[in-house]
Amino acid sequence: MIAVIDVSGNNLTSLTNALIRLGGHFALTHDAQEIQKASHVILPGVGTARSGMTALQQNGLIDVLRTLTQPLLGICLGMQLLLEYSEEDDIPCLGLIPGVAELLKAERNHPVPHMGWNNLHWQKTSSLQQGLNNSDYVYFVHSYALKADDYALARCRYHEEFTAVVKKGNFYGMQFHPEKSADVGMVLLNNFLSLESKC
């Protein structure tokens, strides 16, 4: 069973529809035991870092997420919450992946938020990349990002490079929305769900 963490009342229709298309058995949940028993866990997120961390704290999930051994995927804000810190609201996050979510620099031809389609540049071979290449585009909506670093599986350029896909151990993050990224996003989600679970 796939646990989709639902703590903030976000509209998760696009994500749940994508999982249905992939034939995944999933539950929208904020129950700690259900999350711990899941084969895979997805942490979506829309809103601010503070609201996201507050919702996790109020539902008693911070320590739960920190001790998971199965694959955990953070999407958009969910990826940023996996990091050590966010400049948005100046708030500590889960600390599962080293790094800081920093405000993107706005330029004349690169307004913030970064909104729309952009392509991935894969840096490391990964099971997530299976069936994909550097010509594939995905859909972004974000103002904060992790600088490209050693944990980046894929990078993206929007005036400057940032991490688009990140991995440390069993913790994964996608700064874009795979559920809104057409066929490429479906491949990425399917690849994630195909990762071996140690739960």
UniProtKB/Swiss-Prot annotation:
The alphabetical list of record keywords is: Amino-acid biosynthesis, Cytoplasm, Glutamine amidotransferase, Histidine biosynthesis, Hydrolase, Lyase
Give the main localization category: cytoplasm
Q: Name one GO biological process term.
A: L-histidine biosynthetic process
Q: Name one Pfam family in it.
A: GATase
Q: Which reaction does it catalyse?
A: 5-[(5-phospho-1-deoxy-D-ribulos-1-ylimino)methylamino]-1-(5-phospho-beta-D-ribosyl)imidazole-4-carboxamide + L-glutamine = D-erythro-1-(imidazol-4-yl)glycerol 3-phosphate + 5-amino-1-(5-phospho-beta-D-ribosyl)imidazole-4-carboxamide + L-glutamate + H(+); L-glutamine + H2O = L-glutamate + NH4(+)
The active site consists of C76 (nucleophile), H177, E179
GO terms, molecular function: glutaminase activity; imidazoleglycerol-phosphate synthase activity; lyase activity
What does the record give as EC number? 4.3.2.10, 3.5.1.2
Functional note: IGPS catalyzes the conversion of PRFAR and glutamine to IGP, AICAR and glutamate. The HisH subunit provides the glutamine amidotransferase activity that produces the ammonia necessary to HisF for the synthesis of IGP and AICAR.
**Under what name is this protein listed?**
Imidazole glycerol phosphate synthase subunit HisH 2
Organism of this sequence: Legionella pneumophila (strain Lens)
